[in-house]
């Protein structure tokens, strides 16, 4: 019998103790935390949205069954702690995950939280509920979930078709919040109700999202803040000025602009961290001429990743594959292994020469170039690398014209594959292969924007997912990485490192190294003023 995950390791118990009761260090209650948001979310429906902006703004409204410790920088199985669940245990065969639940927790409208709410949530996510989600971007996470059953009001069991040791990590994602049975998905888009530390007040599109303290929160003494306001400022330079003027307390900025912040406000605390977001080339494999494998590979081999990093990340980005690069990423490949992948050879001219040869065999050349639209989302983290991509594709006889898509239309457009090629950002709700592979590369997944489908490789997805030995699993993951690169499934360009700054009075908020959303519960954050 393969080893099964323990109910809760000693490390998990220690982390749980930390999360449940951070030692008092003269935390001051009260105050309004003003957080910069880079875009206006389509809604605050956590189960339906895919972007970081709604996730960041809404995570504090909800609770998970389990979550990643808010004060451990790297998300991993070892940093998962209880939340609405008080613990978890696996059956001997590794197919049943049972979680006892906290008693006495209330929804923001005063109704009791029970195991029925957990079942309702995952029935929604798997399409079994009578009501349906408008979008279900994470349905692919739960392809191995057969059923969810309840044992009274205070216990729930997830029944799996096969062992999946990392299933708990999917439940810990900031996206894996629990919804109330008694509130419809449509109402959750307009006025989300949770059990979390903050209650929803209002959402003014393109202006702000406002949350207020939940006075009946089940974690005694939390949250410290009276309210949180997410100020929507799309232009990074404008956001910088607002931060320097003290109008916002926390901002996501660029590395060059961070230097201006430190110069103008030297007491500011700034941190550069990766966060696990890749810039990648999406190619509609069903749209000629991109249904040709050599065409897709030629485009992948044209990429000068170092130039992207130098321009966009001030030289501080990372080169990697599907999984976030080491050391911040848990499952990334060593650099010497990455260099062996197609298009990753450090000899750029060799790569491009081979790519031009492929294109010429397809009938393209200096006198017969391919003209097309390159789509991307209308915010700087997408637009800026898209301009560089268009310039680099010229090296392989492709002339691109930038087509800008507003945020509200971006995800629906790429989900229905209404494009030829595009510049995309992909972030994982979890730094785990089960999330990345099934969500972005499995046949029929809503977020498989390129239409990639390889049933034989999916069998390998299942093998790595069921493997309990971490070393053996990594070897399978890297084998999958090689095949995805060879197939040009979704060429990864580079991983950015983001710059985050906060005012010195903001205390007890940890930026995570392999997630940009999982640290936004904010129940432990306080203001020293």
Cite the ranges covered by each PLM segment.
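Extracellular/periplasmic solute-recognition and catalytic clefts
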Residues: 132-135, 148, 201-212, 229-287, ...
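Surface-exposed binding/hinge segments that line
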Residues: 100, 119, 135-181
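N-terminal lobe/hinge region of extracytoplasmic solute-binding protein
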Residues: 36-92, 123, 191-195
């Amino acid at each position: 019998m393969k080893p099964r995950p323990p109910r809760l390791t000693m490390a998990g118990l220690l982390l749980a103790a930390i999360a449940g009761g951070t030692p008092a260090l003269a935390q001051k209650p009260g105050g309004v935390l003003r957080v910069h948001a880079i875009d206006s979310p389509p809604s605050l429906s956590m189960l339906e949205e895919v972007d970081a902006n709604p996730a960041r703004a809404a995570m504090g409204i909800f609770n998970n069954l389990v979550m990643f410790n808010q004060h451990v920088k790297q998300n991993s199985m070892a940093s998962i702690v209880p939340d609405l669940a008080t613990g978890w245990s696996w059956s001997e065969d590794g197919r049943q995950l049972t979680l006892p639940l906290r008693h006495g927790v209330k929804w923001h409208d005063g109704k009791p939280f029970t195991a029925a709410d957990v079942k309702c949530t995952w029935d929604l996510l798997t399409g079994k509920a009578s009501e349906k989600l408008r979008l279900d971007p994470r349905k692919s996470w739960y392809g191995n979930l057969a059923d969810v059953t309840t044992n009274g009001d205070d216990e729930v069991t997830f029944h799996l078709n096969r062992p999946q040791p990392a299933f708990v990590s999917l439940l810990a994602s900031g996206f894996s919040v629990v919804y109330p049975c008694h509130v419809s998905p449509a109402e959750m888009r307009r006025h989300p109700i949770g059990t979390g530390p903050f209650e929803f007040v209002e959402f003014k599109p393109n202006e702000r999202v406002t949350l207020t303290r939940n006075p009946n929160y089940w974690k005694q003494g939390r949250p410290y803040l009276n309210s949180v306001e997410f100020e929507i400022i799309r232009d990074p330079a404008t956001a910088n000025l607002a931060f320097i003027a003290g109008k916002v307390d926390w901002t996501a900025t660029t590395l060059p602009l961070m230097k201006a912040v430190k110069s103008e406000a030297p007491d500011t605390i700034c941190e550069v961290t990766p966060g696990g977001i890749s810039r990648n080339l999406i190619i509609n494999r069903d749209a000629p001429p991109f249904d040709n494998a050599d065409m897709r590979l030629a485009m992948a081999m044209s990429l000068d990743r170092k130039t992207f990093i130098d321009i966009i990340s001030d030289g501080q980005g990372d080169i990697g594959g599907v999984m976030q690069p080491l050391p911040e990423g848990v499952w990334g490949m060593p650099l010497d292994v990455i260099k062996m992948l197609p298009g990753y050879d450090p000899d750029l001219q060799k790569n491009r020469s081979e790519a031009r040869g492929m294109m010429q065999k397809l009938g393209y050349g200096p006198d017969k170039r391919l003209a097309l639209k390159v789509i991307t989302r209308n915010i700087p983290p997408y637009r800026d690398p898209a301009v560089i991509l268009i310039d680099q594709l010229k090296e392989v006889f492709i002339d691109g014209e930038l087509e800008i898509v507003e945020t509200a239309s971006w995800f629906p457009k790429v989900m229905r594959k209404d494009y030829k090629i595009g510049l995309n950002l992909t972030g994982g709700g979890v730094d785990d292969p089960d999330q990345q592979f099934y969500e972005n590369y499995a046949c029929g997944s809503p977020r498989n924007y390129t239409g990639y489908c390889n049933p034989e490789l999916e069998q390998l997805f299942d093998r790595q997912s069921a493997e309990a030995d971490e070393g053996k699993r990594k070897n399978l993951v890297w084998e999958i990485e090689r095949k995805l690169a060879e197939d040009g499934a979704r060429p990864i360009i580079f991983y950015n490192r983001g710059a985050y700054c906060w005012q010195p009075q903001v205390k007890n908020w940890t930026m995570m190294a392999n997630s940009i959303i999982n640290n936004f519960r904010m129940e432990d954050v306080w203001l020293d003023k």
